[in-house]
UniProtKB/Swiss-Prot annotation:
Cross-referenced CDD domains: MIP (cd00333)
Residue numbers on the Vacuolar membrane side: 45-55, 125-143, 194-219
Location of the motif NPA 1: 85-87
Listed GO MF terms: water channel activity
TM region(s), chain numbering: 24-44, 56-76, 104-124, 144-164, 173-193, 220-240
Family: Belongs to the MIP/aquaporin (TC 1.A.8) family. TIP (TC 1.A.8.10) subfamily.
Domain notes: Aquaporins contain two tandem repeats each containing three membrane-spanning domains and a pore-forming loop with the signature motif Asn-Pro-Ala (NPA).
Protein's name in the database: Aquaporin TIP1-2
Biotechnology: May be used to improve drought and salt stresses resistance.
CC per GO annotation: vacuolar membrane
Topology Cytoplasmic: residue spans: 1-23, 77-103, 165-172, 241-252
GN (gene name): TIP1-2
């Protein structure tokens, strides 16, 4: 990845109407995603007496998150790019597809969207607590970090291949479907070990509302490292300097 491709952003970008609209779109998309994903776990607990950690609960979480992410990415794609994830935004920044200023605003919007979604869930359920992400009893923090790195690598690599690559052509809804599928599959693979976050915003909202911060750093460090590796590999190897170009918001 050429260092010169990384953009800080113009001084007035933060207050530009397009940036504000894009940030609002990220807030709404993340709210939709977290409300459905976290809410599905709460509903499963209510119906099965805390059975969300069972195999059936894992499958339910996979389906809910996969479907919800497909929708969240689709509704935001034409406005903000439909990142719905600080790790995806970080990967896009490293590839020169989004400026630092816009990326920071996206992060703020995504984190706020997650917190508001969890607060709405607490209100709508009569005070039920959202469950913060945690490690299984036999999983170390470093096991979890590796899981998050590998799973987020797969997610961000998929984002690059289906949504960022200038040669992608007209894929229509293929990108949101592929992104939803990889998240659902990764939840089946890693959910029993560390919850399979792949998304710092998804972990942040429940942690704030339940005020549970045990090993929370894992769900930032792992996804950001995985996103960075995926962005550097795909942009450096498969896109390359010859085909690299700054993409408009609707194309990343």
């Amino acid at each position: 990845m050429p260092i010169g491709s990384i953009a800080i952003g113009a001084p007035g970008e933060a207050s530009h109407p397009d940036t504000i609209k894009a940030s609002l779109a990220e807030f709404i998309s993340t709210l939709i995603f977290v409300f459905a994903g976290e809410g599905s776990g709460m509903a499963f607990n209510k119906l099965t007496n805390d059975g969300s950690t069972t195999p059936a609960g894992l499958v339910a979480a996979s389906l809910a998150h996969g479907f919800a992410l497909f929708v969240a990415v689709s509704v935001g794609a034409n406005i903000s790019g439909g990142h719905v994830n600080p790790a995806v935004t970080f990967g896009a920044f490293l590839g020169g597809n989004i400026s630092l200023i816009r990326g920071i605003l996206y992060w703020i919007a995504q984190l706020l969207g997650s917190v508001v979604a969890c607060l709405l869930l607490k209100l709508a359920t009569g005070g039920l607590e959202t469950s913060a992400f945690s490690l299984s009893s036999d999983v170390s923090v470093w096991n979890a970090v590796v899981f998050e790195i590998v799973m987020t690598f797969g997610l961000v690599y998929t984002v690059y291949a289906t949504a960022v690559d200038p040669r992608k052509g007209d894929l229509g809804v293929i990108a949101p479907i592929a992104i939803g599928f990889i998240v659902g599959a990764n939840i089946l693979a890693g959910g029993a070990f560390d919850g399979a976050s792949m998304n710092p915003a998804v972990s942040f909202g429940p942690a704030v509302v339940s005020w549970t911060w045990d090993n929370h750093w894992v769900y930032w460090v792992g996804p950001l490292i995985g996103a960075a590796i995926a962005a550097l590999v795909y942009d450096g190897v498969f896109i390359g300097q010859a085909t690299h170009e700054q993409l408009p918001p609707s194309d990343y």
